[in-house]
């Protein structure tokens, strides 16, 4: 049976395991309260540019 040649740090171990978890989890989306489009949480809406109830980018609502 194979034995490790050197100790693997927790950081290196967790980086390796993160690749599996990144592939298995589905992307989470929330509905923008301003325009109703699906968007990523904790980020400005790509459609209307609003975040936390205020305009943060130069886009305007096309509705």
UniProtKB/Swiss-Prot annotation:
Pfam families: Ribosomal_L32p. The gene is rpmF. Belongs to the bacterial ribosomal protein bL32 family. InterPro entries: Ribosomal_bL32 (IPR002677), Ribosomal_bL32_bact (IPR044957), Ribosomal_zn-bd (IPR011332). One of its GO terms (molecular function) is structural constituent of ribosome. It comes from Chlorobaculum tepidum (strain ATCC 49652 / DSM 12025 / NBRC 103806 / TLS) (Chlorobium tepidum). Residues 1-20 are annotated as: Disordered. Residues 7-18 have a biased composition (Basic residues). GO terms for biological process: translation. This is Large ribosomal subunit protein bL32.
């Amino acid at each position: 049976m194979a034995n490790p040649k050197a100790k693997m740090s927790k950081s290196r171990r967790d980086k390796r395991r993160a690749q599996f978890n990144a592939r298995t989890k589905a992307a989470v989306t929330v509905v923008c309260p301003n325009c109703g489009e699906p968007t990523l949480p904790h980020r400005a809406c790509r459609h209307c540019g609003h975040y936390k109830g205020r305009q943060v980018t130069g886009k305007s609502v096309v509705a």
